[in-house]
Amino acid sequence: MVFMPPRHGKSELCSIRFPAWYLARHQQNQVIACSYSESLAYTFSYAVRETIASNHFQNLWKIDLDTAGAIRWQLSNKENRRASYIAAGIGGGITGEGADLLIIDDPIKNHEQADSQIYRESTYNWYKTTARTRLQPDGAIIIIQTRWHVDDLAGKLLKDAEIN
């Protein structure tokens, strides 16, 4: 888990640069990236695609963007291995998909959402019953967020870890 205040670069590093590097290094793996809104998740998806398509990146790794789109896209390479990237909002459609890497960036938008017990519970339940169940064996989860509330998703997961 990565916790920092807003505007400190956590999304740039963890939701854009890292997934591009990860897909280049693990060209058969699947990434699912979620955020509080579909719009933000799609923005990250587009930025990852642009990073991979950049000349600098292509000088390091020759990877072709096999399919285009903000919601779902794939990479292909000489070995014919396919990596994929799926973007969704919290509570969005990831059922039926698998993830070697699950990125949850800013599951809570602001103080207003954080102060809503209903929203916090909904996010936690989505994580337990949907998001976490998409993880492949030996997969990894990265949660990036500003801590708006002691009982937010990260707070609940930290409490769960203490109990277990």
Per-range role (PLM):
Residues 7-8, 38, 92-93, 108-109, ...:
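Short, solvent-exposed loop/turn segments at secondary-structure junctions
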Residues 27-29, 83, 98-99, 136-139, ...:
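Short glycine-/polar-rich loops that comprise or flank the Walker A/P-loop
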Residues 30, 34-94:
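Conserved nucleotide-state-sensing and coupling region of NTP-binding domains
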